[in-house]
UniProtKB/Swiss-Prot annotation:
<keyword id="KW-0786">Thiamine pyrophosphate</keyword>
<keyword id="KW-0479">Metal-binding</keyword>
<protein>
    <recommendedName>
        <fullName>1-deoxy-D-xylulose-5-phosphate synthase</fullName>
        <ecNumber>2.2.1.7</ecNumber>
    </recommendedName>
</protein>
<dbReference type="InterPro" id="IPR005477">
    <property type="entry name" value="Dxylulose-5-P_synthase"/>
</dbReference>
<keyword id="KW-0784">Thiamine biosynthesis</keyword>
<dbReference type="GO" id="GO:0008661">
    <property type="term" value="F:1-deoxy-D-xylulose-5-phosphate synthase activity"/>
</dbReference>
<dbReference type="InterPro" id="IPR029061">
    <property type="entry name" value="THDP-binding"/>
</dbReference>
<dbReference type="GO" id="GO:0000287">
    <property type="term" value="F:magnesium ion binding"/>
</dbReference>
<dbReference type="InterPro" id="IPR020826">
    <property type="entry name" value="Transketolase_BS"/>
</dbReference>
<dbReference type="Pfam" id="PF13292">
    <property type="entry name" value="DXP_synthase_N"/>
</dbReference>
<feature type="binding site">
    <location>
        <position position="181"/>
    </location>
    <ligand>
        <name>thiamine diphosphate</name>
    </ligand>
</feature>
<dbReference type="Pfam" id="PF02779">
    <property type="entry name" value="Transket_pyr"/>
</dbReference>
<dbReference type="GO" id="GO:0030976">
    <property type="term" value="F:thiamine pyrophosphate binding"/>
</dbReference>
<feature type="binding site">
    <location>
        <position position="80"/>
    </location>
    <ligand>
        <name>thiamine diphosphate</name>
    </ligand>
</feature>
<dbReference type="InterPro" id="IPR009014">
    <property type="entry name" value="Transketo_C/PFOR_II"/>
</dbReference>
<keyword id="KW-0460">Magnesium</keyword>
<dbReference type="GO" id="GO:0019288">
    <property type="term" value="P:isopentenyl diphosphate biosynthetic process, methylerythritol 4-phosphate pathway"/>
</dbReference>
Length: 620
């Protein structure tokens, strides 16, 4: 997409933040309007995260106008809201390539721009990193400002509060901005509150506040009186007691869509010492009515026609694996009142919308709190219930100690429904589900299942749910199922694989939903094909049979080769002194960048042609 200078005359003047800071302040509202329209035009053509960026246009302009970026360091949490930031920092003409193979990264990425201070993708990391960056700048004697922008969802995570608690203790010079888009701007976020924010962030108030603390620090009754008086004055309009108690100077809430007001407040706060906290209120989807009305649907969008205000409907094809899981969940809950479902803020993505409506008293969205989600599930299991934790592979990493310490060691019957396992696609390195088999396989008493299709997925969910001797995990990919017939639910024998095709000389041991590709290769090479089903416990007997009956084995999985299912097969063969050649095929030892799932699999040699080529090259 070429940039239309006539359509965006003010934005055309801004190819860097240095150029932005040369603009007269009175032109900034027009810049914000053009930036918002350009974002709509670009994302509707290319797909991507959408509603969050619409809500941070004024904040982004104000931050880069007031702070000397990239010398001053600006950190975005998660990064969904950072598209305007990318546009203003030299990547305007490439924004249409975002999330595409070889294009702009979907999130702030250190290797892409000096303006991207922290590579992100997972939530709630910004304040911790910001403290470290601020401390480093202070120790180096650099007069560098540090600003972290975090959303109202991300700030609920324990890591964010751990960081704020630490900041209150060591008191680095830094600013945390809470982008609160949970509700539309209410009346109290108006002229009075904006005036108060500028007053409280001004040098006079700050000097009086800090000077008063020094003068009266040794006089406890007066110190306490001053503190209570200050809290009383601010408490009339400022809901910031929690952040003040953590050691921050709280300012807000202020209108996050008033670019002139934001600039005034940020200029006042820029030179304040110690940890500062600015609370701004924004509207997700701001400026595009369909996104304002339905910010969840418009959070991340495919290509669409902005004039219609409608996203393209599903073609009505095969259901996704998340839908398969959600249907199984509802079906099981209707029969068993002990089922409890838990998600860390991924209701829509995990296919749990219908369940949350039908069984609200058994649905628990714990917010962005993966560690809590797992230990909460452990508590439910101790209480005699049957918890199912629906979680993305990449996010389960954040609760690894809880899986071991709070679930596995106690052999609690918690089932993990691991969505987005394997290659995820457009969200890139931070979201690929590349490691779950490796990091779960080494945990004692964990049962791990890898379905090859949607029917097997249902059977494994059923099997895991009724397994009472410890935790279980069923991992399934992002994307549509294969269209196989669904059969009545029944328990699978634990740790047993299934031979799908008998061949000669070569046996392919497949783990998971690469089965259709494996079947094509097995047919082409006249190889035996095995659906291994279980990564733990492995079917040792079947593995040894395949080794005895074939000249060579190939393992296939959409997980890191290192420590994955194939490594488990190698261990079985070595333990039994079977010197059969084995080729492990899976995800390589590097972080897989963005692109479609099909592009990634083709590039990594995980489509049928690539798998066959790998095997032939190995046999040559």
């Amino acid at each position: 997409m070429s940039f239309d200078i006539a359509k965006y005359p003010t934005l055309a003047l801004v190819d860097s933040t240095q150029e932005l800071r040369l603009l007269p302040k009175e032109s900034l509202p027009k810049l914000c309007d053009e930036l918002r329209r350009y974002l709509l035009d670009s994302v509707s053509r290319s797909s991507g995260h959408f509603a969050s960026g619409l809500g941070t246009v004024e904040l982004t302009v104000a931050l880069h106008y007031v702070y000397n970026t990239p010398f001053d360091q600006l950190i975005w949490d998660v990064g969904h809201q950072a598209y305007p930031h990318k546009i203003l920092t030299g990547r305007r003409d490439k924004i249409g390539t975002i999330r595409q193979k070889g294009g702009l990264h979907p999130f702030p990425w250190r290797g892409e721009s000096e303006y991207d201070v922290l590579s992100v993708g997972h939530s709630s990391t910004s304040i911790s990193a910001g403290i470290g960056i601020a401390v480093a700048a202070e120790k180096e004697g650099k007069d560098r400002r540090t600003v972290c922008v975090i959303g109202d969802g991300a700030i609920t995570a324990g890591m964010a509060f751990e960081a704020m608690n630490h900041a209150g203790d060591i008191r680095p010079d830094m600013l945390v901005i809470l982008n609160d888009n949970e509700m539309s701007i209410s009346e109290n976020v108006g002229a009075l509150n904006n005036h108060l924010a500028q007053l409280l962030s001004g040098k006079l108030y700050s000097s009086l506040r800090e000077g008063g603390k020094k003068v009266f620090s040794g006089v406890p009754p007066i110190k306490e009186l001053l503190k209570r008086t200050e809290e009383h004055i601010k408490g009339m309009v400022v809901p910031g007691t929690l952040f003040e108690e953590l050691g921050f100077n709280y300012i807000g809430p202020v209108d996050g869509h008033d670019v002139m007001g934001l600039i005034s407040t940020l200029k006042n706060m820029r030179d304040l010492k110690g940890p500062q906290f600015l609370h701004i209120m924004t509207k997700k989807g701001r400026g595009y009515e369909p996104a304002e009305k339905d910010p969840i649907t418009f959070h991340a969008v495919p290509k669409f026609d902005p004039s219609s205000g409608c996203l393209p409907k599903s073609s009505g094809g095969l259901p996704g694996y998340s839908k398969i899981f959600g249907d199984w969940l509802c079906e099981t809950a209707a029969k068993d009142s002990k089922l409890m479902a838990i998600t860390p803020a991924m209701r829509e993505g995990s296919g749990m919308v219908e369940f949350s409506r039908k069984f609200p008293d058994r649905y628990f969205d714990v917010a962005i709190a993966e560690q809590h989600a797992v230990t909460f599930a452990a508590g439910l299991a101790i209480g005699g219930y049957k918890p199912v934790v629906a979680i993305y592979s990449t996010f389960l990493q954040r609760a690894y100690d809880q899986v071991i310490h709070d679930v596995a060691i106690q052999k609690l019957p918690v089932m993990f429904a691991i969505d987005r396992a394997g290659i995820v696609g457009a969200d890139g390195q931070t979201h690929q589900g590349a490691f779950d088999l490796s990091y779960l396989r080494c945990i004692p008493d964990m049962v791990i299942m890898t379905p090859s299709d949607e029917n097997e997925c249902r059977q494994m969910l059923f099997t895991g749910y009724h397994y009472n001797d410890g935790p279980t995990a069923v991992r399934y990919p992002r994307g549509n199922a294969q269209g196989v017939a669904l059969t009545p639910l029944e328990k699978l024998p634990i740790g047993k694989g299934l031979v799908k095709r008998h061949g000669e000389k070569l046996a392919i041991l497949n783990f998971g939903t690469l089965m259709p590709e494996a079947a094509k290769v097995a047919e082409a090479l006249n190889a035996t094909l095995v659906d291994m089903r279980f990564v733990k416990p492995l079917d040792d007997t079947l593995i040894l049979e395949m080794a005895a009956q074939h000249d060579a084995l190939v393992t296939l999985e959409e997980n890191a080769i290192m420590g994955g299912a194939g490594s488990g097969v190698n261990e079985v063969l070595m333990a039994h002194r079977k010197p059969v050649p084995v080729l492990n095929i899976g995800l390589p030892d590097f972080f897989i960048p963005q692109g479609t799932q099909e592009e990634a699999r083709a590039e990594l040699g995980l489509d049928a042609a690539g798998i066959e080529a790998k095997i032939k090259a190995w046999q040559a």
